[in-house]
A protein has these predicted regions:
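Glycine/serine-rich phosphate-binding loop and adjoining beta1-alpha1 elements at the start
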Residues: 1-32, 69-74, 81-88, 93-196
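A short, aliphatic-rich alpha-helical micro-motif
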Residues: 115-116, 196, 255-259, 283-284
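Glycine-rich adenosine-cofactor-binding loop
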Residues: 34-47, 189-218
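ADP-ribose/adenylate-binding Rossmann-like module
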Residues: 124, 135-144, 263-271, 276-308
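Adenosine-phosphate binding glycine-rich loop
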Residues: 3-19, 44, 158-191, 289-397
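Adenosine-nucleotide cofactor-binding segment
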Residues: 222-259, 264-271
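NAD(P)-binding Rossmann-fold cofactor-contacting core
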Residues: 63-73, 85-92, 220-241
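Histidine-anchored nucleotide/phosphate-binding helix
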Residues: 43-59
């Protein structure tokens, strides 16, 4: 299989049971045969496993990287900033090209469409290629990308809408934040045995990513305080772990927390979430180590890029592997499998049969993944992977 040397040197098969199962299945069924697929998953070593499964299924693969070319503003106001500056590993981008797979930015993708060489399906991330017009629709990997598809005329499955994505965000992303801090010298939360007790963390956001960060920090022995929108109701996870919570609209209290923090990390998924004068002033006057774990700049323009680790990009992307493959395998498998489902629903089982218009039997715009498909991928991950016990703990089983 393509990329075998890199994959076999870096991973054991139990780290990617779901993608391995899809690759084996699709090598026989070839659901993507003669179809052009653009995949915009952030390009890192573990992403090669998703490419490999799709290629096994017969896909004519094109890899998309936002910002690769200039002139992105021509895509239109709604999509022009989607996924801007999405991190990638330049070395892996080179590997992809060396294996004969085209790598394009948004402008080149639009030019391909204009020249009659458009895409049958786009597996997107953070709405990077939402300005395109794939025949059978999109699959969006992240919650932050959904905003770019709210008025989309094509069907859009959102891989972040269900249970599978919790494996990546609750277990993998939080662990990636901790690893990144350790790589930068904050060894209190690495596997070195150092203790995080006494370090004060303020986590903005209590969704899947925020909860995952809190979980990892609690395991390290750190003191954690969460800032979130309390009008949304109580959070069972935070309540069960005795994590103190402050409402994001109580600006005096938030500013006080920031001033006393050793570390501040954002995980709200909202651009400019901390862009309040009182909070910005507290951040600029604080000694805290600032980091962002969202795709968007959650600090806003009032906080200089240089004041935040990794220049406001998601901190785990400084790592060779931002999220360990064992935690992201199920998400990438769902991303790809939802693509197969769109083709089936649009009448394209093999080749390019089916209607010229996008999947007429499906509504346009964002849709949740079917629970049956998620359960299938979850079963693969728990039965054949390395993290079954961690998933069971996360789910409270």
């Amino acid at each position: 299989m393509i990329f075998d040397e890199i994959v076999n040197d870096a991973y054991e098969e139990r780290e990617y049971p779901a993608l391995l199962a899809l690759a084996h299945e699709w090598s026989g069924t070839r659901p993507f045969r003669a179809l052009r697929l653009l995949v915009a998953t952030p390009v890192f070593r573990n992403t090669l496993l998703e490419y490999r499964a799709l290629i096994a299924g017969g896909a004519d693969l094109v890899v998309g990287v936002a910002g690769l070319d200039s002139g992105e503003e021509g895509a239109g106001a709604d999509a022009s900033n989607a996924g801007a500056g999405m991190p990638c590993d330049p070395g892996i981008v080179d590997v992809v090209r060396e294996n004969g797979i085209p790598v394009v930015g948004l402008q080149e993708a639009l030019e391909m469409e204009a020249a009659g060489r458009g895409f049958d399906l786009i597996l997107d991330c953070a709405g990077q290629f939402s300005a395109c017009h794939p025949r059978f629709g999109f699959v969006e990997l992240t919650r932050s990308g959904v905003q770019f598809y709210e008025k989309c005329e094509h069907p859009v499955y959102v891989a972040d809408s269900g249970i599978v994505k919790r494996i990546e965000t609750c277990l993998g992303t939080g662990e990636g934040y901790v690893r990144a801090l350790a790589q930068l010298g904050h060894d209190f939360c690495s596997d070195s045995g150092a203790d995080g007790a006494g370090k004060e963390f303020v986590v903005f956001g209590s969704g899947k990513v925020g909860q995952g960060i809190v979980l990892q920090l609690l395991r390290s022995g750190a003191s954690v305080h969460v800032v979130t929108d309390c009008s949304l109701g109580s959070n069972p996870f935070l309540d069960a772990n005795g994590v103190p919570v402050t409402d994001c609209n109580d600006l005096d209290a938030v500013a006080s927390l920031v001033r006393g923090a050793d570390f501040v990390v954002t995980a709200t998924g909202v651009k400019g979430a901390l862009d309040r004068p009182q909070v910005v002033e507290a951040l600029l006057g604080s000694h805290a180590v600032l980091a962002n774990m969202g795709v968007e700049d959650e600090y806003g323009p009032g906080v200089p890029t240089s004041r935040v680790l990794a220049e406001k990009k998601p901190l785990n992307f400084i790592l060779e592997e931002p999220t360990h493959l064992k935690y992201i395998d199920a998400s990438l498998a769902l991303h790809a499998a939802l693509g197969e489902l769109l083709l089936q629903e649009g009448g394209a089982v093999y080749g390019k049969e089916g209607a010229d218009s996008p999947a007429a039997n499906k509504k346009a715009g964002p849709m949740d993944p079917p629970s049956e498909l998620e359960q299938r991928i979850l079963s693969m991950t728990m039965q054949d992977g390395l993290i079954g016990a961690e998933i069971a703990e996360m789910m409270g089983w």
